[in-house]
């Protein structure tokens, strides 16, 4: 069965390369495993509830980032994204705290 990918766009170029090729340059080596799990969850999700996985600490962002969601990667590092109509957009890998 052919499955459509949910992830449609990236802000962070190294995260995109990691997603497409598995090459982890540009992402912290100690974050690679968690990012791989989170990207896989995003890419198979149909709803935001599908991504509410223990350990990911999924939560909506507020203020200027309203409309975006966040996964905790490690410490202050987050995977942030918009989720609209069953697709993930503008994925970013950032230390935003």
Give the location of each predicted region:
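A short, surface-exposed loop/turn module that caps and links secondary-structure elements
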Residues: 46-69
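Generic structural signal for secondary-structure transition and capping sites
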Residues: 23-24, 44-47
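Basic/aromatic-enriched alpha-helical hairpins
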Residues: 38, 43-44
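Arg/Lys-rich, positively charged N-terminal/basic patches that mediate binding to nucleic acids
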Residues: 1-38
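A secondary-structure boundary/capping signal
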Residues: 11, 54-57, 92
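Short, electropositive, low-hydrophobicity segments enriched in small/polar residues
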Residues: 26, 67, 79
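Enriched for short, Lys/Arg-rich terminal
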Residues: 1-5, 62, 70-97
């Amino acid at each position: 069965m052919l499955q459509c990918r949910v992830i449609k766009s990236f802000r962070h170029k190294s995260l995109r390369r990691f997603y497409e090729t598995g090459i982890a340059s540009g992402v912290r080596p100690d974050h690679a495993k968690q990012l791989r799990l989170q990207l896989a969850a995003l890419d198979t999700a149909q709803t935001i509830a599908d991504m509410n996985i223990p350990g990911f600490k999924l939560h909506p962002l507020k203020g200027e980032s309203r409309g975006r969601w966040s996964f905790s990667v490690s410490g202050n590092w987050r995977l942030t994204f918009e989720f609209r109509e069953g697709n993930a957009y503008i994925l970013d890998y950032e230390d935003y705290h």
